[in-house]
Structure formats: C-alpha cells, structure tokens
Amino acid sequence: MARERDDDACPGALQTHQAADGELARVRLPGGVLTAAQLDALANAATEFGTATLELTSRANLQIRGIRDTGAVAAALAEAGLLPSPTHERVRNILASPLSGRHGGVCDTRDLAHALDSALQRDPDLVRLPGRFVFGIDDGRGDISGLGTDVGVHVLDAHTVALLLAGRDTGVRVPLHDAVDELLRVARRFTEIRGTAWRVGELADPAELLGQREPTAPPGKTWPASVRPPVGWIEQDDGRIALGAAVPLGVLDARVAQYLAAVQAPLAVTPWRSVLLFDLDEGVADVALRVLAPLGLIFD
C-alpha cells in the first residue's frame, strides 16, 4: 500500500538527517564498492566531524553520525570521489553480488553494476526516484535476488537474465547486454506511475511496470534471503585471497576502518554488514587477518 504523503526524507550525503546525536549522512556505494583511499577518507571524516564510527547499512552503504559540520563532510566525500553526481547521489542504490568475478557466480557482473550506475547518473528523469528505491544485480548465485530489491536482474546464463520486481521473477527474460537499459526503463516507468509509493512492492499492480514485455517463463519464483555474510578466508577463482569480515552490530570504528584501508586492497561493503578485502596474496592475507581479527572484526 502506498503512503498518503510523499515526504521522502531519506538521507544522503548532502541532504542529511537530524538524528538525536546530530546530523546523519548516508553515503551511497553502488555495488558496495570502494577503494582503500575512499574508506580512509570516510574514516577521517567520521573522526574529525562525527562520532568516529561508520555504520554499515543493509543496502551496502555507509553512514556517518553525529556530524558537526555537514559542509566539511560533503567536501571530503567529493574530494574522495564519493559524490560523482550531486543531483543523483540519493538514488544510486545498487546492490550487486559482492564476490562476482572473483569467486563463484554464473558470470562476472561488475561491469554491469558500474554501467548501471553511470547510466543512472546521466538520466535527468531518474533524479525523481525515491531515495529508498533499490536496484539489484545478482550474478546467479542467489545472494542479491533474495533481498527483495525494487527492480533487479538475476543472471541465468552467460547471455540471459531474469527480470525481477520486488524480488519476484516476472517471467520476462532479457539479453544480458540489454540489462541496464531494461532496469532503467522500469525505473523511469516507476517514476511515472508511483503516486506516493516509495517502493515497487507498494504499487497496486507492479506488473504495470513491464509495459509491453511478455513473460516467456513461469513467473512468481522467489529466492530465499541470505542471512550469513561471506566471511573468512575465501580463495578467489584466480588463486588470490579475499578476506571477509563481519562487523558487529554493523558499527565499524573509524580506527579499524583505517587499518582496513592500510591493507591497500580493493574493498566492498556487503548488505549483510560485512566488509570484503580482495585480490590479496597469501602472505598479505595472513598478516591482515592476524592484525584485523584482534580489533573486533569477525572472520569465522
């Protein structure tokens, strides 16, 4: 059921939320991806202007709480490359299989997530999306499709994806190379018909978003929600190591974030409030594990 009002106060990095402990900024990380330098910049901003913690959200974003100078935080985020589009910063909600291209999955969807983010920022109509609207890209393993994103694709094979609405298979099949266009088409249609709805599941008939698309497979399939984050020592398909660490209560001390950044490896935040370090050789992974585990991160 849609809400009677359309007051979308969903916070971003520029439109912050006044919480009991001060201003709260939510930083979108499409696909959960960020660099070591970006994590370090976030940790420094949280230390200098906030509560010296970073909160991990169920949408693989990060939050800074208790902000005393919102302008300074926004400037720090922009300098770190975390605000590529001030107009679209609240709508860059993209969940993607965090281990894709490195461990398991039907195919590597990292480029797909990046292309979706880039195309989303270029579309002036999509600035009207609610801040709660979420895209999903599942590389076939079923980790993201079970999270009930508003519109998503689930890879079936190297050439085909299933189109999902509110976490449910519509029966519509789309060529993999058309997936971004299809996701954006559905999102545009949502802005046209949503009324006061913030999420696809609030529409009286989500199938209206399909337009002329006809299902070619039985619709209705859902995927179970994944509750266990990818943690521990994970051998990548290329022989290198990924380390997965659960963050207790989803609250990451800024000092611990700085230690994570010091590993100088690609990172991802997951929807299960964990962090992944990628592309490590065994020696570096072993040292990182020995340093990070005593700091309160959970690797098992």
Language-model-detected regions and their locations in the chain:
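A conserved active-site cap/scaffold subdomain adjacent to cofactor or substrate pockets
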Residues: 180-183, 187-193, 240-242
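Flexible, glycine/charged-enriched surface loops at secondary-structure junctions
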Residues: 53-56, 126-130, 191-210, 216-227, ...
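Small-residue-enriched alpha-helical segments and adjacent helix-cap loops
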Residues: 2-3, 19-164, 169, 173-181, ...
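Accessory "access/gating" subregions that flank catalytic or transport cores
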Residues: 211-250
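Intrinsically disordered, low-complexity polar/charged tails and linkers
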Residues: 1-16, 38, 228-234, 243
